[in-house]
Amino acid sequence: MSMTPREIVSELDAHIIGQNEAKRAVAIALRNRWRRMQLPEELRQEVTPKNILMIGPTGVGKTEIARRLAKLADAPFIKVEATKFTEVGYVGKEVDSIIRDLANVSMKLVRQQAVEKNRMRAQDAAEDRILDVLLPPAKDQWGNVQESDNTSTRQIFRKKLREGQLDDKEIEIDVAAQVSVEIMTPPGMEEMTSQLQSLFEGMSPNKTKKRKMKIKDALKVMVDEEAAKLVNPEELKQQAIEAVEQHGIVFIDEIDKICKKGEHSGGDVSREGVQRDLLPIIEGSTVNTKHGMVKTDHILFICSGAFQVARPSDLLPELQGRLPIRVELKSLNKEDFERILTEPNASLTLQYRELMKTEGVDIEFTKDGISRIAESAFRVNEKTENIGARRLHTVLERLMDSISFDASERSGEKIVIDEKYVSDALNDVVENEDLSRFIL
């Protein structure tokens, strides 16, 4: 991650409105990953990541920040829900599976990078295989390949192949047969399932099967096959583990849902158990994965939660201490809703305009229309449950309902969505609290 904090914030600004404090914290944490790697080896081991706790109501951008980070961070990244895990001894996934899943993500990322690195060599080898099908080499009576004078013909066909002139021609090729082993195991034993599948697939002989396909499709398949032959699996495992240990990022959502509430017991015991199981992973421990042992000392953890019922102080004190950076995300107001409708690169109004364009219908959202939509969403949030920006989706779906249904019969029309149009479509529902609760 060589982007500066300012560049990271700017990239997040293109998709997320407001919440500058959270963006800054995340940007600094990401940049510190790069800074740490520039330090001498001895000092580098001493610098641990400053984990982040994001606190804010639902629908203000916590999950969206995670989604955008996953695209920005050229590093192993995984987002998980805290509620999916149970403490050891209960039925369900154990928290160690977070690191195993992160190692799998890292392996996939490293393999993709290795394939891209070898793509040119793989492309040449794949072209040779296709040319062998199109122009089979001549063989003598003992089956040995003869030196022939078809080199010039081969070059002509290679040129046609690269220019795409042969793309739609069908050929029959030998491709590696995918061995699939289905194993049913109880919940919480996914790691055993994965290891058994790897074992049985490794025992199966490498088989090929004949498939008929267009040359452009055959070329893609063969490039992937040839690239896979050029990578060293053991080397990939080492690179994947190093990438996880030095650059891995884990985003844990809904962390507030595993807080112990008040003096209740029962199910809360398991919740507190999940927190206890998270402690060693966040602090630094070693987890066994199918790719090797992974140390979690330098993995960055970003946790988030609404904390509407529980409070951050309800987390175990030890866990609070392992999340030193606290960031509070603010509730969204009407002006924020207006910006969300227009400013992001793929704003909601732009999405609806482009969707309707596919039917030949031209949609125009006026400034006063957008203001009225934002006001309606804000008022419904105030009257009923506050679900933040997610309310805009339900309001817009209600607003666009008749247009979406009739669009295929209204090709060539231009529809202006102004304040009057929005009021006529939404007033009854917005004003009636019972209707708002069930429809919006």
From Swiss-Prot:
Gene3D superfamilies in UniProt: 1.10.8.60, DNA helicase RuvA subunit, C-terminal domain, P-loop containing nucleotide triphosphate hydrolases
Keyword Oxidoreductase among record annotations: no
| An annotated GO BP | proteolysis involved in protein catabolic process
Q: Which GO terms describe its cellular component?
A: HslUV protease complex
Q: Where in the cell is it found?
A: Cytoplasm
Top-rank taxon of the source lineage equals Bacteria
Q: Which residues cross the membrane?
A: none
Q: Name one GO molecular function term.
A: ATP hydrolysis activity
**Keyword annotations from UniProtKB, A to Z:** ATP-binding, Chaperone, Cytoplasm, Nucleotide-binding
- Listed Pfam families: AAA (PF00004), AAA_2 (PF07724)
Q: List positions binding ATP.
A: I17, G59, V60, G61, K62, T63, E64, D253, E318, R390
NAD in keyword set: no
Read off the InterPro entries from this record.
Answer: AAA+_ATPase, ATP-dep_Clp_protease_ClpX, ATPase_AAA_core, Clp_ATPase_C, HslU, P-loop_NTPase
For this UniProt entry, what is the primary localization, expressed as one broad class?
cytoplasm
> What does the UniProt record say this protein does?
ATPase subunit of a proteasome-like degradation complex; this subunit has chaperone activity. The binding of ATP and its subsequent hydrolysis by HslU are essential for unfolding of protein substrates subsequently hydrolyzed by HslV. HslU recognizes the N-terminal part of its protein substrates and unfolds these before they are guided to HslV for hydrolysis.
Q: How does it assemble?
A: A double ring-shaped homohexamer of HslV is capped on each side by a ring-shaped HslU homohexamer. The assembly of the HslU/HslV complex is dependent on binding of ATP.
Family in the record: Belongs to the ClpX chaperone family. HslU subfamily.
Q: What is this protein called?
A: ATP-dependent protease ATPase subunit HslU
Species this chain originates from: Glaesserella parasuis serovar 5 (strain SH0165)
